[in-house]
Amino acid sequence: MVSEVRAQYEAYPYPTRDPAEEKTRLITGSPSHVLEVDHFVFGGARDWSRPLRVLVAGGGTGDALIQLAQQMKNAGRAAEITYLDLSTASRAIAEERARVRGLGGIRFVTGSLLNAAEYGEFDYIDCCGVLHHLPDPAAGFRALLAALAPGGGMGFMVYAPYGRSGVYPLQEAFATLFDGMVPEARLNAARKIMAGLPEGHPFKANINLGDHKDSDAGFYDLLLHSQDRAFDVTTLCDMLEATGWHLSGFTMPALYDLGRLTEVPDHLGRVERMALAEKLNGTIKTHVGYAVRGSEARGQGTGRNRALIPHVKGLRAADLARAVAQGQSPKLSFGGLRARLSLPKEAARLIAAVDGRRSLQEIAQATGTDPIGMGALWSRIERELGDHGLLVYSSILRR
């Protein structure tokens, strides 16, 4: 099975990337946005005078590697990054992307994440879209924990079942039909069948999926992968706990907030609430989040600590502040979620003061907001923005 997976990524490195485009754009996302790493792994208060030792486990064509290396360079912070992947074709693309950007401090290794500890001890591990492709995912979780330095953590993405409806029956059918065929032949045969699917087919009805439309590599990874499983929230949390990890948080908490969908029975625990929200939502196709060592379980950054430095992520703080001051309720649409931000006009002055360098205490002083007013307003801001992945805490820009 491992040889089939390797053959797939040698034939179709994923995701499809053109290194020449590094001259004109930086692909960012979750996990491994550097602000998120600080927020979820280090409580928003990492000592950035120390180099960040990073393992990108299953680095593919380099999205996480390039994002993190470039953001560290932009912030003037030191990083020692190890890229690890089975595919030499994927590695070649990642190396060229780094070369085009002039990024240094990267060690490229061809190998398995099951041997992660052989390559050192790491403060942060990225493992995006890999663990669900292992024959024994638990072995992968344990192998990464063995490579984790004290106080460190991991950013992960694993597939979720409900937003991928229609995928797995097709995968099973194609695996039987095309057994023994080379990747190129499998792809051509599958495309012919897909062209004839009835309009009412569950896969065609699933508007959350798009990889099969983007490229040959995307089609193959979605529908022809030889080793693929999905984790619902309960299974994922059980897996993390069983392998020595603790869930720090998902990057989009609103997706897992049962209270946004219905009244919450008092007897439900945290995981039960998230699991029910996942089922009611029905559109979550990946779980993206961060985890720390179970024996070092700790919370993510929170506004209760006024020494932390907030960042508005994904949009301009000034633009958001202007909209809030005008009484607008900006629309949000991502991850299967459609919502509107609802903030009082008084919150605008606090949002406008967020510059990635001032602490909450300094923002309160600069805006003349008393402690009680600050607490009330900021809790609203944190819930509205933080739950939608738009607010994190990090000291990376503070000198």
Language model region names:
Residues A11-L52, Q67, Q71:
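Conserved alpha-helix/loop element of class I SAM-dependent methyltransferases that forms part
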Residues A138-P150:
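A short glycine-rich, Lys/Arg-flanked "PGG" loop and its adjoining helix->strand segment in the class I
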Residues N115-I125:
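A short acidic, Gly/Pro-enriched loop at the edge of an enzyme's catalytic core
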Residues T61-R77:
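Conserved SAM-binding loop of SAM-dependent methyltransferases across substrates and taxa
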Residues L258-A291, G336-R399:
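Long, charge-rich, low-complexity alpha-helical segments
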Residues R101-L114:
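Conserved SAM-binding strand-loop segment of SAM-dependent methyltransferases
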Residues D123-P137:
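A short SAM/SAH-binding and catalytic strip from SAM-dependent methyltransferases
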